[in-house]
């Protein structure tokens, strides 16, 4: 099973509807399982996954989530390699918010499923509490999400009790990076690859927030919504 050093930064990424067998997986070995990490919120996550079991193709091959998801964000050149290398170095740990699984480690193995992220469903099943416990257990100092602002993913991350997380004393900064894209026309095709490139650039810059916010992606810049400040 994969073992990584304690991370200094946590990232949240969205899943993708497209899932394909990886040709060159970055996590070919057995991955971690979020359910075995959690203590207080494990039951809620388990129940949430059980309620969506019919959406999962249990006969499909399973692969690490970072390798399996193959939408526009995950097709950005260098994204998988950059994320995997940063995880192995202890720079980051990554949770992918998943419509079928709630949340999974980037190296956690999953089956193919057909289920969009449903904010109401996962709110009832305590997904925000799952994220909160994971943050606290990690001991990380900074937490960022790379998510579209108006999606269910963003709403789930905002629903975390960030004031309580910060009062715990470990998290010094938490933010939600989103492309400042006006309107919805063209967003579905342009925002995901911009998010992927931003993740690669953020890791490559040594997590330089100012540098990321100064760059343009698809003709627009990112904004960072502070969480719990």
Regions from the PLM with identified roles:
Residues 1-229:
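Peripheral peptide segments
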